[in-house]
Amino acid sequence: MAPTTTNPMNETIPGSIDIETLIPNLMIIIFGLVGLTGNVILFWLLGFHLHRNAFLVYILNLALADFLFLLCHIINSTMLLLKVHLPNNILNHCFDIIMTVLYITGLSMLSAISTERCLSVLCPIWYRCRRPEHTSTVLCAVIWFLPLLICILNGYFCHFFGPKYVIDSVCLATNFFIRTYPMFLFIVLCLSTLALLARLFCGAGKTKFTRLFVTIMLTVLVFLLCGLPLGFFWFLVPWINRDFSVLDYILFQTSLVLTSVNSCANPIIYFFVGSFRHRLKHKTLKMVLQSALQDTPETPENMVEMSRSKAEP
């Protein structure tokens, strides 16, 4: 039978709370609460106070995916610390489906942001004149719908009704998609990021640094360091080896903490990039976010003009 989509979370946690379980889950709750606050503020600013462009649509959806992912993280860690268990396997599988969909959606949004930026740099004329107007909105809808549909089909045909009703062909197809789709997204993310870096440092017409470019690069870097390890444990390890050793369990718990750091890091990145070399005394959060997503190279002249325009009511 094909490997299932359920992550090792429910299968590897000891019955009693020990230090290896207590500390990681407390850290997840702390990082999660910080991330929930940051992503709520980010979602509020992007959704109601800024004019949305192609990149802001992706960033808005990424903030929503991070918020929901952190919420699930906090719920799971709280249940573990309180020794509360879901009443049946169907609810366990539903929870796993939600976590898997949110992880894939976050990776998809990040890949879309990097690819969109790559296209805007490598094909600027096509991007400004020929790109369909509602591409970002349509693509975000597909990004949410596709993994949700596949994971629901996988859970329905592979888990909800027990081994007697398993349809092997559907399980094989959906499991193959769930294992390979994140790999494809990771390859797209890496290739688009490398293309941007190559154009920046090696291209004939070198692209100048913008705050948006720095924001995207830092977001990708944090994901590679903090978000990718959990994907390895969720999508590859169960396929290669079903048995978890003590070391695997410790590494898995570490990857859970790191992914909570990844999901709470983006608002911090935006604040850091938006406030770098700027005085914060008279700047609102909206102005800091606008600065972090600024897509024009900074010169002393336009920095003065931008600060004057933002100071106006």
Swiss-Prot record:
Return the Pfam families for the record.
7tm_1
Instruction: List the InterPro entries.
Output: GPCR_Rhodpsn, GPCR_Rhodpsn_7TM, MRGPCRA, MRGPCRFAMILY
Query: Which residues carry a glycan?
Result: 10, 76
What Gene3D superfamilies does this protein map onto?
Rhodopsin 7-helix transmembrane proteins (1.20.1070.10)
Keywords, A to Z, come to:
Cell membrane, G-protein coupled receptor, Glycoprotein, Membrane, Receptor, Transducer, Transmembrane, Transmembrane helix
UniProt subcellular location: Cell membrane
TM region(s), chain numbering: 26-46, 55-75, 94-114, 138-158, 183-203, 220-240, 256-276
Q: How does it sit in the membrane?
A: Multi-pass membrane protein
Q: Which residues lie on this side of the membrane: Cytoplasmic?
A: 47-54, 115-137, 204-219, 277-313
UniProt note on tissues of expression: Expressed in a subset of sensory neurons that includes nociceptors. Expressed in the subclass of non-peptidergic sensory neurons that are IB4(+) and VR1(-).
Molecular functions per Gene Ontology: neuropeptide receptor activity
Q: Which domain of life is it from?
A: Eukaryota
Q: Does the keyword Cell membrane apply?
A: yes
Provide Extracellular-side residue ranges. Answer: 1-25, 76-93, 159-182, 241-255
Alphabetical GO CC annotations of the entry are: plasma membrane
PANTHER family xrefs: MAS-RELATED G-PROTEIN COUPLED RECEPTOR (PTHR11334), MAS-RELATED GPR, MEMBER A2A-RELATED (PTHR11334:SF33)
Q: What does this protein do?
A: Orphan receptor. May be a receptor for RFamide-family neuropeptides such as NPFF and NPAF, which are analgesic in vivo. May regulate nociceptor function and/or development, including the sensation or modulation of pain.
Record-stated family: Belongs to the G-protein coupled receptor 1 family. Mas subfamily.
Instruction: Tell me what this protein is called.
Output: Mas-related G-protein coupled receptor member A4
The protein's organism comes out as Mus musculus
Q: Which gene encodes it?
A: Mrgpra4
